[in-house]
C-alpha cells in the first residue's frame, strides 16, 4: 500500500514538471524580422527592425531585447507586456558590414534573429535621365534609349492593363539588369516600390523596331527591351521608372520615366438598390449595374448568419442567385439582371452584388409582404397623409398666385409692345483696311508677323461693328414703323407682312462708288413676341448679289447656336456664267444683337481675307430687300474630321469602306492646310479655332480653312478680354492662361489638327476632363504618337506643342518641313484613283461653330 502511494506522488510531481515545461515553452517570446534588405550603400540610413510576440494566454512578463554586432552589444530595451518592437538605425560606413543579432528573452525562454549586412561604396557616377538616341555624336560605352521612348505616356481608366516597353541600345559585352519602380511623380525612384527586376535572361532583343536606327549606333551595340505588365489603380497619377544598369557598374546607369494618368471620373462603382419591398405573387426584377467595362457580376442570396461587420467576407454558405436564370433572365455587358416571377416569402432576405475583378459589393434588403386593397391605408401612418396634404395645398396656392401674377403682367405688358428700328454700323479706323478688303495691295505669303506684312507703317485695325437704335415708336401711322402688337397669332402674322411691305417702299439702290452706302433691314422677332427689331445693314457694291438670282433649297447643311446653313443655287455669281451650287448662311428667327454683331464681323473678316485655294471663299452677300444672306463656296465632302473618320473603323457606319489613307495623302492634306494658314498669317489673321471640324473638303479633295466665328485681325497679338465657350483642347497655353492669341497660338492648334488627321479623327486628350487639360500641358503631357504618323511627323507635332511660343515653327517653316517629308515618302501613286472612288462619302457637315466642345 505504501508503495502505491509513493508511485502516485511521483506521478503528480512528474505531471507538475511537464506542465511547468509546457508553460515555459508556450510563453517564451517569438521573434519576427521586419526588414529583409541586406545590401546597403555608404551614407544610406540602415533601418533594422525585429518584433517580439508572446502568446496571449500567458501572463504579462518582463521582456528584454538586445542588439549585437559581431557579438558586441549595441543597445537594449526592456518592456513589460506581451509584445515588443525595436528598431535599430544607423548611417552607414564601409566598416559597418557584419553580422547583426536581435536577441530577446524573458523568464520562460529566449529567441534571436540574425541580419548579415553588406555595405558597399556609394555610387560615384551620374544616372543618365531620358538619354535618347537623337542622331548627335555618340560614345561607345554608353546606354542609349530608343528614340520612340520619348513619345510614350498613358491616359487610362481605372483597372486598365498597360504593357510598357523599356527599349534601349547597349554594348554587346555588358551584362545588364533592368529594374522597374512605381513612385509618385513628385519624387524619384530611390524611394519607390520595386515592381520587378529583370536579369539578363529576361531581356530580349528587338531588331524590328530598331532597324532604321542601326546606322546611328556603334557596331558593337545591340537593341534590347524589357517589358512590364501594369494595371492602373484609381489613383489620378503615378510614374513608372525603368532603370538600366550593368552588373559590375562599368558604365553609367540610364533611366526613363513613364507617366500614367488615370481618369478619376471613371472610378468603378456598383448600382444595386439598397432596399426593395414587393407584394406576394407579383413579378420583381433584380438588377445590378456597374461602369466597369466587360465586368463579371455575381448576385448572391446571403445566409441569415452573414455578418456585414466582418472585414473578411465569407460567401460559402450563401446561394449564387445569378445562376438561377429562367427564360426571362438576362445579362448585358455592364449589368446582371434577374426577373423573379410570382414572388413568395422565401425570396425575402439580403442579397449581395459583387464585382469579380475588384473588392466592390453592394447589399439589398428585399421584403416580400402580403398585399390587400386596404393595405396602403392600414400600413401608412396618418402623419404621412397630413404632411402630403400640406405640401399639395402649398403647391396649389402657389399656382393660383402665379396665375394671377401672369394675368397682371400680361395686362401691363399689352400696353408696352413696340418695335425698335436699328442700324448696323461698320466703322473703318484704319485708312488701309478698305484697300485690304478691296484687294488693291500686294502681300507676302512666306512670313508670319503682321508688322512685316503691312504695305506701310500704319497698323492694320479690324472694323468696329456697332448696332444703334434709330427710333422707338408706339404707333404705326404716317409711314412710321411701330404698332401695338396684336394679341393673336393671326394678327402677328398680318403685322409682320405689313412691316415687310412698308419697308419695301424704303429700299435704296446699292451705289457703285466706294463711299456710297444705303441701308436696308433685317427682321428679328423675339421668342415671346413682345417686340420686333428692324435691322438696317450697310450695302457694299463689290459684294452685293441680287437676291432674285439666288435659290435656296431645303437641304440643310448645318446649324449653330444662332445661324443655319442651307445649300443653294446661284446664277451668274463671280466669274461663273452657269448656275453653281453654293452654301448660304443665314440668321435664325430668335437671334440677338450680339449674334448680329458676331455674324457681321465674320462677314467683314471674310471680305478682308480674300481668295486662296485653301481658304473657304466668300462669293457674295444679300443685304437688301430681305433678310441677310452670306454666300460661300460649297464643300461637298463636309468637314475633315468626318471625312477621315469614314476610314476609321471606330466611327464609320458604312458597310463598305473603300481603300485606305496613305501617309502621302495625309501629309498632302496637312500641307494644304499649312499653306492656307501661311496665307491667313500674311493677312494678319489669327484663326483661334483651328481644328479638323473647321476644315472643309472641296470638290477636288482640296482642304479649305473655314469657320471664322472666333477669328480676329491682329497687330502682332490679340488679347481676349471676355470669357466664353472655347475649344480648350485645341488651345495654346498662353491662350488658356493669359488670353493672348498670336499666329504661334494657331501653330499649337495646327499641331493638334495634325494629330487628328493621323489618328483618323480621334479626339485629343480623350480621357481627360477639359478643366484638367491646362495643368497637364504645363507638366509637359502630350498626346501619344498616332499609329499612322512616322517619326518625323510626330516630331513636327511636338515642335508645334512647345510650351514657349518662341520655340514653335512658323507656318512657312511647317510648309517647308512637310514638302521635304512628302518627297521622302515612298507611296504608291494611286491618290487620284482612290479619290475618284470616294464620291459615295459626300457627308453633311456643320459650317458653323459646333454647339459644344468635343
Swiss-Prot record:
Expressed in brain, stem cells and the mesenchymal cells. Residues 1-20 form the signal peptide. The keyword NAD does not apply. It is a single-pass type I membrane protein. ATP binds at residues 557-565, 585. Residues 551-822 form the Protein kinase domain. Disulfide bonds join 50-102, 166-242, 288-353. Its EC number is 2.7.10.1. The chain crosses the membrane at residues 384-404. One of its GO terms (molecular function) is transmembrane receptor protein tyrosine kinase activity. The modification Phosphotyrosine is found at residue 718. It catalyses: L-tyrosyl-[protein] + ATP = O-phospho-L-tyrosyl-[protein] + ADP + H(+). Residues 405-854 are cytoplasmic. GO terms for biological process: cell surface receptor protein tyrosine kinase signaling pathway. It is found in: Membrane. It comes from the Eukaryota. The keyword Transmembrane helix applies. Glycans are attached at residues 95, 99, 110, 118, 140, 175, 202, 248, 283, 317, 346. Residues 29-120, 147-259, 268-369 form the Ig-like C2-type domain. GO terms for cellular component: plasma membrane; receptor complex. Residues 21-383 are extracellular. Belongs to the protein kinase superfamily. Tyr protein kinase family. Fibroblast growth factor receptor subfamily. This is Fibroblast growth factor receptor 1. It comes from Dugesia japonica (Planarian). The gene is FGFR1.
Amino acid at each position: 500500500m505504501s508503495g502505491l502511494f509513493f508511485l502516485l506522488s511521483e506521478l503528480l510531481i512528474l505531471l507538475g514538471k511537464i506542465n511547468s515545461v509546457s508553460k515555459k515553452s508556450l510563453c517564451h517570446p517569438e521573434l519576427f524580422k521586419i526588414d529583409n534588405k541586406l545590401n546597403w550603400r555608404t551614407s544610406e540610413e540602415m533601418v533594422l527592425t525585429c518584433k517580439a510576440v508572446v502568446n496571449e494566454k500567458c501572463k504579462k512578463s518582463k521582456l528584454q531585447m538586445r542588439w549585437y554586432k559581431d557579438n558586441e552589444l549595441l543597445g537594449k530595451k526592456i518592456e513589460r507586456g506581451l509584445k515588443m518592437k525595436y528598431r535599430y538605425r544607423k548611417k552607414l560606413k564601409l566598416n559597418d558590414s557584419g553580422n547583426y543579432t536581435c536577441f530577446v528573452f524573458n523568464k520562460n525562454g529566449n529567441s534571436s534573429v540574425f541580419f548579415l549586412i553588406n555595405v558597399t561604396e556609394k555610387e560615384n557616377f551620374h544616372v543618365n535621365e531620358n538619354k535618347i538616341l537623337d542622331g548627335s555624336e555618340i560614345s561607345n560605352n554608353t546606354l542609349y534609349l530608343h528614340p520612340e521612348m520619348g513619345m510614350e505616356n498613358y491616359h487610362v481608366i481605372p483597372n486598365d492593363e498597360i504593357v510598357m516597353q523599356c527599349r534601349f541600345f547597349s554594348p554587346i559585352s555588358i551584362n545588364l539588369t533592368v529594374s522597374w519602380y512605381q513612385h509618385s511623380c513628385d519624387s524619384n525612384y530611390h524611394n519607390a516600390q520595386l515592381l520587378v527586376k529583370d536579369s539578363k535572361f529576361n531581356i530580349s532583343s528587338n531588331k524590328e523596331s530598331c532597324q532604321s536606327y542601326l546606322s546611328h549606333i556603334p557596331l558593337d551595340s545591340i537593341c534590347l527591351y524589357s517589358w512590364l505588365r501594369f494595371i492602373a489603380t484609381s489613383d489620378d497619377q503615378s510614374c513608372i521608372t525603368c532603370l538600366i544598369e550593368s552588373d559590375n557598374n562599368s558604365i553609367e546607369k540610364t533611366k526613363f520615366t513613364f507617366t500614367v494618368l488615370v481618369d478619376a471620373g471613371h472610378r468603378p462603382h456598383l448600382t444595386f438598390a439598397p432596399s426593395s419591398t414587393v407584394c406576394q405573387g407579383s413579378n420583381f426584377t433584380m438588377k445590378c449595374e456597374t461602369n466597369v467595362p466587360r465586368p463579371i457580376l455575381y448576385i448572391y442570396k446571403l445566409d441569415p448568419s452573414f455578418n456585414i461587420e466582418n472585414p473578411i467576407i465569407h460567401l460559402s454558405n450563401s446561394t449564387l442567385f445569378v445562376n438561377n436564370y429562367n427564360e426571362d433572365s438576362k445579362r448585358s455587358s455592364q449589368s446582371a439582371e434577374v426577373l423573379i416571377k410570382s414572388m413568395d416569402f422565401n425570396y425575402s432576405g439580403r442579397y449581395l452584388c459583387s464585382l469579380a475583378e475588384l473588392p466592390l459589393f453592394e447589399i439589398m434588403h428585399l421584403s416580400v409582404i402580403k398585399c390587400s386593397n386596404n393595405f396602403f391605408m392600414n400600413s401608412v401612418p396618418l402623419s404621412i397623409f397630413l404632411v402630403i396634404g400640406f405640401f399639395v395645398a402649398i403647391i396649389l396656392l402657389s399656382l393660383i398666385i402665379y396665375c394671377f401674377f401672369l394675368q397682371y403682367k400680361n395686362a401691363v405688358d399689352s400696353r408696352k409692345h413696340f418695335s425698335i428700328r436699328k442700324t448696323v454700323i461698320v466703322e473703318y479706323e484704319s485708312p488701309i483696311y478698305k484697300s485690304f478688303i478691296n484687294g488693291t495691295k500686294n502681300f507676302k505669303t512666306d512670313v508670319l508677323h503682321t508688322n512685316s506684312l503691312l504695305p506701310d507703317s500704319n497698323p492694320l485695325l479690324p472694323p468696329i461693328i456697332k448696332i444703334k437704335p434709330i427710333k422707338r415708336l408706339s404707333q404705326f401711322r404716317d409711314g412710321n414703323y411701330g404698332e401695338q402688337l396684336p394679341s393673336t397669332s393671326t394678327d402677328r402674322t398680318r403685322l409682320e407682312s405689313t412691316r415687310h411691305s412698308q419697308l419695301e417702299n424704303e429700299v435704296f439702290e446699292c451705289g457703285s462708288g466706294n463711299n456710297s452706302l444705303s441701308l436696308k433691314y433685317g427682321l428679328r422677332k423675339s421668342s415671346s413676341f413682345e417686340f420686333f427689331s428692324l435691322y438696317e445693314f450697310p450695302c457694299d457694291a463689290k459684294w452685293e448679289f441680287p437676291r432674285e438670282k439666288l435659290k435656296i433649297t431645303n437641304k440643310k447643311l448645318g446649324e449653330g447656336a444662332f445661324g443655319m446653313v442651307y445649300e443653294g443655287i446661284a446664277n451668274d455669281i463671280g466669274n461663273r456664267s452657269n448656275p453653281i451650287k453654293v452654301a448660304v448662311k443665314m440668321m435664325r428667327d430668335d437671334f440677338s444683337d450680339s449674334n448680329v454683331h458676331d455674324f457681321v464681323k465674320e462677314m467683314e473678316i471674310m471680305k478682308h481675307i480674300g481668295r486662296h485655294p485653301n481658304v473657304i471663299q466668300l462669293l457674295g452677300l444679300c443685304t437688301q430687300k430681305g433678310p441677310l444672306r452670306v454666300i460661300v463656296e460649297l464643300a461637298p465632302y463636309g468637314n475633315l474630321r468626318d471625312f477621315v473618320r469614314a476610314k476609321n473603323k471606330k466611327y464609320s457606319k458604312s458597310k463598305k469602306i473603300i481603300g485606305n489613307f496613305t501617309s502621302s495623302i495625309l501629309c498632302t492634306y496637312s500641307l494644304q492646310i499649312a499653306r492656307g494658314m501661311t496665307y491667313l498669317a500674311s493677312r494678319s489673321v489669327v484663326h483661334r479655332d483651328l481644328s479638323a471640324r473647321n476644315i472643309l473638303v472641296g470638290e477636288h479633295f482640296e482642304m479649305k480653312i473655314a469657320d471664322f466665328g472666333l477669328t480676329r485681325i491682329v497687330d502682332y497679338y490679340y488679347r481676349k478680354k471676355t470669357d466664353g465657350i472655347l475649344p480648350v483642347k485645341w488651345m495654346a497655353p498662353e491662350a488658356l492662361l493669359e488670353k493672348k492669341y498670336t499666329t504661334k497660338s494657331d501653330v499649337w492648334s495646327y499641331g493638334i489638327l495634325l494629330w487628328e488627321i493621323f489618328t483618323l479623327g480621334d479626339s485629343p486628350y480623350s480621357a481627360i476632363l477639359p478643366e484638367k487639360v491646362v495643368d497637364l500641358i504645363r507638366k509637359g503631357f502630350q498626346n501619344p504618337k498616332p499609329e499612322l504618323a512616322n517619326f518625323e511627323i510626330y516630331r513636327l507635332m511636338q515642335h508645334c506643342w512647345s510650351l514657349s511660343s518662341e520655340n514653335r515653327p512658323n507656318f512657312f517653316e511647317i510648309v517647308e518641313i512637310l514638302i521635304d517629308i512628302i518627297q521622302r515618302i515612298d507611296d504608291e501613286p494611286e491618290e487620284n484613283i482612290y479619290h475618284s472612288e470616294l464620291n459615295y462619302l459626300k457627308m453633311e457637315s456643320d459650317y458653323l461653330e459646333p454647339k459644344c466642345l468635343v
